[in-house]
Amino acid sequence: MSVDLPVAQRRSFRGPALVVACVLVMSVCLTWAFFAMRAVMNVGGSCADGGPYVSAQPCPGGAGLIAIAIPVMIVTAMVGSAAAISVGAPNLLIPMWGFLFGSLGWNFLESAVTGPDIVWGWLVCGVVFELMALPAILAILAGVKTAVLPPDRPAPGTGSRWWVPAYALLGAVGFLFGAWSFAALS
């Protein structure tokens, strides 16, 4: 004797698998954007390759990956957020926003203060980028607090508590793969 579950109670692995894939792709793209920007900042902040004119500063290896990384990351965050909603996981747009602007702001700040003189333009950009990242980082911290210390005891198997460490682990794996692949492609 078998009992069929209603369609609404059947669990599919497609939604969670899509969220996992999106977190990994987002992490790789974030890493590529971080290192590509850093490479360009190391040659003065601007470069060019190809075209009818000869550039005074050719682009370093891997600099072009930023043109792929940011659009792919944005689309992946949107698709991943839609999938995350369907499985009760946190959205990916807020972490993407916070980590993108936070990491690029870090590059500006570090480049502004590591030379012989302070580069005020980069310092201002770094502060602005960090201020743009701040609301998302605060939202992430509030979400982590709620996931770790929920106000009410959640029912077993509901909510997104287990996604918090999963996102952190997947982000770390994506970062490592992104760093390795950036070095290989540069």
Where are these regions (language model features)?
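Alpha-helical transmembrane segments of polytopic membrane proteins
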Residues: 58-77, 107, 120-135, 166
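Perimembrane loop-to-helix junctions flanking transmembrane segments
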Residues: 42-62
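Membrane-proximal helix-loop-helix units in multi-pass membrane proteins
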Residues: 95-141, 151
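Transmembrane alpha-helical segments of multi-pass membrane proteins
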Residues: 22-26, 90-112, 159-172
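Alpha-helical transmembrane segments of multi-pass membrane proteins
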Residues: 26-43
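Juxtamembrane boundary at the C-terminal end of a transmembrane helix
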Residues: 46, 174-186
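Cytoplasmic membrane-interface segments at the C-terminal ends of transmembrane helices
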Residues: 4-17, 76-98, 132-165
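Hydrophobic alpha-helical transmembrane segments
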Residues: 14-17, 45-47, 66-80, 102-120
